[in-house]
Amino acid sequence: MKKPSSKIREEIARLQDQLKQAETREAERIGRIALKAGLGDIEIDEAELQAAFEDVAKRFRGGKGSATGKRQAGDSRTGSEPYATQPTGADAGGLSEA
């Protein structure tokens, strides 16, 4: 039996709300981590910061190359990609302020 279009619209609206809530939680989590790392005190262009975050994401996904600060068509995170285990602290070799 097929669902009526009104039920499908209700389900889509419910799922969009769930997606918005999940994205908000993720953004707040990343924001808290960025503030703890001191990024709130650094004067940096938004495009540069975007590129740095993309580099970090590639590092944890196991990719290589530098980011441009712009999203490519088809770039999306589904949550199904595995994360690579990376060292933390001084051995991480991540972003640092000179």
UniProtKB/Swiss-Prot annotation:
Q: Which residues cross the membrane?
A: none
According to the UniProt entry, which residue ranges have a biased composition of type Polar residues? Answer: 75-88
Would the keyword Metal-binding be found if you checked this record's keyword annotation? Answer: no
Q: Where are the residues of the annotated region Disordered? A: 60-98
UniProt entry keywords in alphabetical sequence: Conjugation, Plasmid
Keyword check for Chloroplast:
no
Q: Which NCBIfam families match?
A: CjTranTraC_Agrob, PRK13848.1
- Name the chain's protein: Conjugal transfer protein TraC
Q: Which organism is it from?
A: Rhizobium radiobacter (Agrobacterium tumefaciens)
Task: State the organism's lineage.
Answer: Bacteria, Pseudomonadati, Pseudomonadota, Alphaproteobacteria, Hyphomicrobiales
